[in-house]
Amino acid sequence: MPYRQTENVVRRLAARHDAILAAACDAAEEGGMAAVQIAAVAGRAGIAAGTVYRYFPSKIELVAALVVALCARELATLEHAAKAAPGPLSALAAALATFAARALAGRRLAFALTAEPVEPEIDAARAPYRQALAAEFEKLIRNALAAGHLPDQDAALAAPALLGALIEGLIGPLAPAAGDDPAKVRARVQMLTLFALRALGVVDARARGLVVQTVVPEPR
């Protein structure tokens, strides 16, 4: 008769899996993808390296699982912000502001997930995160287009272009430091949200009104 894991065993294995991913996330937040090493993650999780290998046979698989988990978390946050907005254009503005605010609040992790120079294998493992973000922005752009709030454009081209501009402006090597001053962080978020809306063809007065009305999320 084949062995069947009890519910307690299943829960314990799932909890350890989540603890490993949480430790990997902490490592990435502090030191980028270079810090996501099996031994270091094991130490943070309080387990042996061999235990991590039982869940994730290589660093590539660990990074891929981390990307999946963080992607789900960030997309859920963007979707929640968009759904709470009163209309398609407001939903787009809310998602843009939420992305900007969270990227600035977790700048090291955001850089690690999107732009940090890494080995080709690691870059391939984290590519789904950028793809998912671009797809979410594309959906919101299409909704605004369908409602007649944006001039005609190729949403599939505009979305990744917009994402690239936001990443570089928020967390790229050329981005100026926002510091910890809440007022300066809020101003940075609003400025880049305004930039993005203008780039999509929203007239200045309307774009400014949307930015003023959009709730900037508190630091996570």
PLM-predicted stretches and their roles:
Residues 1-4, 135, 139-146, 171-220:
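C-terminal peripheral helix-coil segments that are non-catalytic and often amphipathic
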Residues 13-25, 41, 66-70, 74, ...:
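Generic hydrophobic, amphipathic alpha-helix propensity
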Residues 19, 27-61, 65:
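Helix-turn-helix
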Residues 23-27, 102, 165:
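Short amphipathic alpha-helical elements of helix-turn-helix/winged-helix folds
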Residues 37, 110-114, 153, 205-210:
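Short, hydrophobic secondary-structure boundary micro-motifs
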Residues 65, 76-106, 159-162, 186-189:
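Hydrophobic alpha-helical connector segments
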Residues 69-75, 121-147, 156-171, 187, ...:
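Amphipathic alpha-helical packing segments from all-alpha helical-bundle domains
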Residues 80, 112-120, 212-215:
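Short linear capping/connector segments at secondary-structure termini
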